[in-house]
A protein has these predicted regions:
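Predominantly the C-terminal beta-signal and adjacent terminal strand-loop region
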Residues: 166-239
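Transmembrane beta-barrel strands of outer-membrane/channel proteins
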Residues: 22-28, 71-77, 119-127, 159-161, ...
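Extracytoplasmic loops and strand-loop junctions of Gram-negative outer membrane beta-barrel proteins
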Residues: 38-44, 84-88, 139-145, 212-219
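Transmembrane beta-barrel architecture of outer-membrane proteins
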Residues: 51-57, 95-101, 152-156, 170, ...
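Short glycine/proline- and aromatic-enriched beta-strand/turn motifs that initiate or cap beta-hairpins
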Residues: 14-68, 223-239
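Gram-negative (and chloroplast) outer-membrane scaffold detector with strong preference
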Residues: 61-140, 148, 165, 229-239
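Membrane-spanning beta-strand positions in outer-membrane beta-barrel proteins
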Residues: 19-21, 68, 116-118, 154-156, ...
Length: 239
């Protein structure tokens, strides 16, 4: 009987040290590396030509002994538009990105302070879709085309500031660097599309295996990294 009581008390004490927060918010995305560049780079097959975008997300945080675990579901959009070559053609390129992220978070907050800090790391599953539009572009028929949906696995890290400015609600201001396509890179091509259209209607973050056989059609020479900085504001409510 004594052992049961002691076990119950220990379980209750452990449970009291576990916290749960849920919330949602908005974010700004700044593509980096091969995900950035210009639409001329996109037409040349070297980068994606994305400028910036926004995201909407839901976040959950579970506080354990000494550290937290967090999970995020987010929907992001990025786009770029401009010329295909200097003074020629029009290109509009947009991606929609659905991501699920999870990982550990280490709280660096001073005791009883309304301002806290954290650092974290995560793994992610990222699904891309989108459209690309060409007008008066050499080697590609004019029109709007769908991007074939593709899933990649990534990682990321960052940190943030926690502000307890009003009762119950914590404002989470985060900065993170995302590597969206660490695993799963591939080139997708068909023989039915005209000219170099295949290069643009799939994510094609791996080298075209036919690169070098025809410079007008097979243009993707290298693997392309899809990375981005992300700045977020999330309102979290304790449960």
């Amino acid at each position: 009987m004594i052992l049961i009581v002691v076990s119950f008390c220990q379980s209750a004490d452990l449970f009291s040290q576990i916290s749960l927060q849920i919330g949602g918010g908005l974010g700004y995305i700044s593509p980096a590396g091969d995900y950035g560049g210009s639409t001329i780079d996109f037409y040349d097959g070297t980068k994606y030509g994305m400028s910036s975008g926004f995201n909407y997300h839901a976040k959950a945080r579970v506080g354990l002994l000494g550290f937290n675990l967090f999970g995020i579901i987010e929907y992001s959009t990025v786009s770029g538009d401009g010329e295909s070559e200097a003074g020629q053609g029009e290109v509009e390129n947009s991606h929609s990105l659905f991501s699920i992220k999870a990982g550990p978070e280490f709280n660096l907050s001073p005791p009883l302070s309304p301002v806290g800090f954290y650092i974290d790391g995560f793994v992610s599953v990222n699904t891309f879709s989108g459209t690309v539009k060409f007008q008066g572009v050499a080697e590609v028929p004019s029109g709007e085309y769908d991007l074939e949906s593709a899933t990649r696995f990534g990682v990321g890290a960052g940190g943030g500031v926690l502000l307890d400015l009003i009762p119950i609600v914590t404002f989470d201001i985060g900065v993170h660097y995302n590597l969206y396509n660490v695993l799963g890179q591939t080139y997708t091509g068909t023989t039915t599309n005209p000219k170099r259209l295949d290069a643009y209607t799939s994510l094609n973050d791996d080298k075209d295996p036919l690169y070098g056989t025809d410079d007008d059609i097979y243009i993707i020479e290298n693997t392309r990294a899809i990375n981005a900085w992300q700045f977020t504001l999330t309102a979290m409510i304790g449960i």
